[in-house]
Amino acid sequence: MQLNVNGAQAIEVSERTFGGEFNETLVHQAVVAYMAGGRQGSKAQKTRSEVSGGGKKPWRQKGTGRARAGTIRSPIWRGGGTTFAAKPRSHEQKLNKKMYRAALRSILAELVRLDRLVVVADFAVDAPKTKGLVAKLDTLGLKDVLIVTDGVDENLYLAARNLAHVDVRDVQGSDPVSLIAYDKVLVTVSAVKKFEELLG
């Protein structure tokens, strides 16, 4: 299949990488797994045995007329422990590499179908200046965009750092969430080749 390149000749690309069917279930699974992996999972609360104090029985077992109590740190008391206390845990979800790559291929194919993938021959800025990048994006009519290059471009990264709706990634740093989060995805021809190499 062919991909149109902005201001240049169309390029031949792999049907497997850019022309497959959209698998919504798989993409959803990849997005959930990616976002779950980013969770810190360090929250912690104290159970009745962990709250300080409460060693002595508040009053004797029988004869007071009050409900029996063994500790002032019971979950039903003010200042007591939490009944089912949250503990630190990993939220990581297992996703095979094969499934992850298939999800990325599915997203790329859908971006092509929805005309959200903009391919350019090359994209760079001379200096790490936001103004220069904004002017360059304006000529392409792009506002909310993810820029994907084949390698890390420091000037481009620094120029985009202060723009709320612009992000810069290299191919290996692209993930399911960032690829679907923006209105448009701007990729260079060399990045397209790198995607084919990694996902082909």
From Swiss-Prot:
| GO terms assigned for molecular function | rRNA binding; structural constituent of ribosome
BP term (GO), one: translation
Instruction: List the InterPro entries hit by this protein, alphabetically.
Output: Ribosomal_uL4 (IPR002136), Ribosomal_uL4-like (IPR013005), Ribosomal_uL4_dom_sf (IPR023574)
Q: Where is this region: Disordered?
A: 38-67
Return any one Pfam family short name. Ribosomal_L4
Q: What are the disulphide bonds in this sequence?
A: none
Q: Which keywords describe this protein according to UniProt?
A: Ribonucleoprotein, Ribosomal protein, RNA-binding, rRNA-binding
**GO CC annotation, single:** ribonucleoprotein complex
Lineage, top-rank taxon, reads Bacteria
Family, similarity comment: Belongs to the universal ribosomal protein uL4 family.
Record note on quaternary structure: Part of the 50S ribosomal subunit.
The function of this protein is: One of the primary rRNA binding proteins, this protein initially binds near the 5'-end of the 23S rRNA. It is important during the early stages of 50S assembly. It makes multiple contacts with different domains of the 23S rRNA in the assembled 50S subunit and ribosome. The P.aeruginosa S10 leader is not regulated by the E.coli L4 protein. This and other data strongly suggest the S10 operon is regulated differently than in E.coli.
The name on file for this protein is Large ribosomal subunit protein uL4
Organism per entry: Pseudomonas aeruginosa (strain ATCC 15692 / DSM 22644 / CIP 104116 / JCM 14847 / LMG 12228 / 1C / PRS 101 / PAO1)
